[in-house]
């Protein structure tokens, strides 16, 4: 991972155009090729970003005499031809880290079993729901359950034993990413847990995410559709 704190301006060129004027920002370049631009607010959300696969080309900026100005132009381009054009005026700090392979989120036994039970009995979320798959892979980690509602629209489900704000934020990130996929959108969100904290429920509802309280014992008591041996 490469972290650059720099004074920069940013232009997005693609389906629309957007401009960020000159300011101090964090430029984050990850090993997967993604590039994101952050300000010192907005929690985890970048001001702008480009997801992989994409390319990054850095070119020194010269004046009329061909002399280097000390500035550089970063051009980040995806396969659709959309570009982030980052004019780096001054670098305050730059560091590179090799974080290695991340083991991913490790669920406790109850959360893992809740996911298994809910996937098997997906109509717990509502009549007409059908399962697409468990652990649906994305660039930022697997979605616990991806399914369709009775209208045939995609639903991403995040499962927790105790649902807090962090879980809602995690589901929000998945929804932002999945809703860029033309084959999946619109993608709705369901935050499912045995217990949901009031602050998390308020945040979820504010973001249009449905909250569902799961009864673990009741789910365990539902007769399985799969053959089991005792």
Curated annotation (Swiss-Prot):
Entry EC no(s): 3.1.-.-
InterPro entries (UniProt xref): Endonuclease_NucS, NucS_C, NucS_N, NucS_N_sf, Restrct_endonuc-II-like, tRNA_endonuc-like_dom_sf
GO molecular function terms attached to this record = DNA binding; single-stranded DNA endodeoxyribonuclease activity
Which cellular component, as a GO term, is one annotated location?
A: cytoplasm
Which key words tag this protein in UniProt? Cytoplasm, DNA-binding, Endonuclease, Hydrolase, Nuclease
- Gene3D superfamilies attached here? 2.70.180.20, 3.40.1350.10
Q: What does this protein do?
A: Cleaves both 3' and 5' ssDNA extremities of branched DNA structures.
Annotated PANTHER family: ENDONUCLEASE NUCS (PTHR38814:SF1)
**Stated name of the protein:** Endonuclease NucS
